[in-house]
Amino acid sequence: MATIYKVTLINETEG
């Protein structure tokens, strides 16, 4: 579950 959270965070930062 932490992986999805991390990917979401990166995607949000990348824009």
UniProtKB/Swiss-Prot annotation:
Keywords: 2Fe-2S, Electron transport, Iron, Iron-sulfur, Metal-binding, Transport. Binds 1 [2Fe-2S] cluster. Residues 5-15 form the 2Fe-2S ferredoxin-type domain. Its cofactor is [2Fe-2S] cluster. The keyword Iron-sulfur applies. It comes from the Bacteria. GO terms for molecular function: 2 iron, 2 sulfur cluster binding; metal ion binding. The keyword Thylakoid does not apply. Ferredoxins are iron-sulfur proteins that transfer electrons in a wide variety of metabolic reactions. Belongs to the 2Fe2S plant-type ferredoxin family. This is Ferredoxin. It comes from Anabaena sp. (strain L31).
